[in-house]
Every structure is written in structure tokens, then in C-alpha cells.
Amino acid sequence: MNSATLTDEQLQSLDARIQSIPIVETLGMKINKLEKGHCEATVPRHKRWDGIYETFHGGMLGTIADTVTCWSILTEIGADAHVATTDFNIRFLRPCHTDVVCKAHVVRIGRTMCLARADL
């Protein structure tokens, strides 16, 4: 994991929070990059996560997008902040037959709500 905009202390705190989330281990998620307001992660494709058409199941892709956008928000508000998804929308443009690279970034930080976007 690398970062040009976060301190070593911030990275360690974020990494500890991320590694404490069970889905990270379950999916084999790897953080490629953490920057202020941005996160990039990779998830390997396994057949056990396929949907009916032998492609990465859409629900799994949604879980990945939700998780990585959360991490991008935590880079802005702190690793110890309490966060929850309140609204979620995803559009599938094509089937996924490969490992997934998810790039998420914060669009807006509000007083009580944050908006983030992910591309897979």
C-alpha cells in the first residue's frame, strides 16, 4: 500500500481498521493505494462467487464497491469514525470475468453525510 497524501500513522490506523473487517479476508481484498479521498483495491475472481452466467456475481461486486468507497471516506474523516451506507446505486455495464480493481473517490464530505463513487 502506498500514499503520497497520508502520514505513516494514518496509513497504519486505516490498515488496522481495514484488516479488522471480516469481508476483507473472505474476499482476499488487497489495498493497492490509499490517498486522501481515494482508495484502490483488488479482489481476485473465484468461481465460488459467480452468478448464474459464470461471471462475478453482481451482489459481490456491489459489496466490493461499498467497502472500497467506505475506505475512501475514512481517509478523509479518520479511521475511527463510525460510518454506514445510507444509499447505494450500481449500474452494471458488462459482465465481469476477471479479477476486480475498484477505484473509489470521495465526491463530497458533508456535516453528517458523505458522497463517494466507485468504478470497477
Across the structure, where does each feature detected by a protein language model lie?
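Terminal targeting signals and extreme-terminal segments of soluble enzymes
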Residues: 1-120
